[in-house]
Amino acid sequence: MSDINAARLPSFFFPIPCISDDIEMVLTRGESLC
């Protein structure tokens, strides 16, 4: 089930995988700049 949760996080917040630094900024701002 851990895999499902890990897969949901990126899919729910941002469908496009970005750099870890970008992910933090995206989560903070709530907008994907990819």
Curated annotation (Swiss-Prot):
> For this protein, what is any one GO molecular function term?
toxin activity
Share the record's PTM remark. Answer: Processed by the macrocyclase-peptidase enzyme POPB to yield a cyclic decapeptide. POPB first removes 10 residues from the N-terminus. Conformational trapping of the remaining peptide forces the enzyme to release this intermediate rather than proceed to macrocyclization. The enzyme rebinds the remaining peptide in a different conformation and catalyzes macrocyclization of the N-terminal 7 residues.
**Annotated InterPro entries:** Amanitin/phalloidin
Q: Does the keyword Magnesium apply?
A: no
Q: Which residues form the signal peptide?
A: none
Task: Look up the coiled coil feature and give its residue ranges.
Answer: none
Keywords of the record, alphabetical order, are:
Toxin
Q: Where is this cross-link: Cyclopeptide (Ser-Pro)?
A: S11-P17
Which residues get removed as pro-piece?
A: 1-10, 18-34
Q: Does the keyword Calcium apply?
A: no
Sum up the protein's function in the record's words. Cyclic heptapeptide that belongs to the MSDIN-like toxin family responsible for a large number of food poisoning cases and deaths. Cycloaminide B is non-toxic to mammals but shows immunosuppressive activity, probably through the inhibition of the action of interleukin-1 and interleukin-2.
Q: Which family does it belong to?
A: Belongs to the MSDIN fungal toxin family.
Q: What is this protein called?
A: Cycloamanide B proprotein
